Swiss-Prot record:
The keyword tRNA-binding applies. Belongs to the universal ribosomal protein uS7 family. The gene is rpsG. One of the primary rRNA binding proteins, it binds directly to 16S rRNA where it nucleates assembly of the head domain of the 30S subunit. Is located at the subunit interface close to the decoding center, probably blocks exit of the E-site tRNA. GO terms for cellular component: small ribosomal subunit. InterPro entries: Ribosomal_uS7, Ribosomal_uS7_bac/org-type, Ribosomal_uS7_CS, Ribosomal_uS7_dom, Ribosomal_uS7_dom_sf. PROSITE patterns: RIBOSOMAL_S7. CDD domains: uS7_Bacteria. This is Small ribosomal subunit protein uS7. The lineage of its organism: Bacteria, Pseudomonadati, Pseudomonadota, Gammaproteobacteria, Alteromonadales. Part of the 30S ribosomal subunit. Contacts proteins S9 and S11. One of its GO terms (molecular function) is tRNA binding. NCBIfam families: rpsG_bact. It comes from Idiomarina loihiensis (strain ATCC BAA-735 / DSM 15497 / L2-TR). PANTHER family: RIBOSOMAL PROTEIN S7. GO terms for biological process: translation.
Amino acid sequence: MPRRRVIGQRKILPDPKFGSELLAKFINVVMVDGKKAVAEKIIYGALDILAEKSGKDRLEVFDTILDNIRPMVEVKSRRVGGSTYQVPVEVRPVRRNALAMRWLVDAARTRGEKSMSQRLAAEMLDASENKGSAVKKREDVHRMAEANKAFAHYRW
């Protein structure tokens, strides 16, 4: 590990339609093979479907959805004296957002609707009601951390 200077994180430009950095990050998560225009079309389409069904502001609903998916704790493997323990650790805020977005997109990709916009909108709708695959993933991670609470003193 280099001991020189800490490299700062790049500043992400806000998305063109809503001016939200979080939404711009989500567009980058959805993007495949560098096709940003396609990713934007998918997300804006999903947000339109979501706004139509819920009747609320798009960004407000998006923030609520991410809040329902964000993990607070996760487990990390730690080797102590020949055995590996799953140690629960708190998740940093940037990683919370990244995991929530990744889980949301993964859950949407496994759904059965026709277009990706419809799949994403359906998964977002489920997440806003605290159900769906992405929320289940968060609950599984929390359950795993709760089960291994006894090893919390191995934290580093």
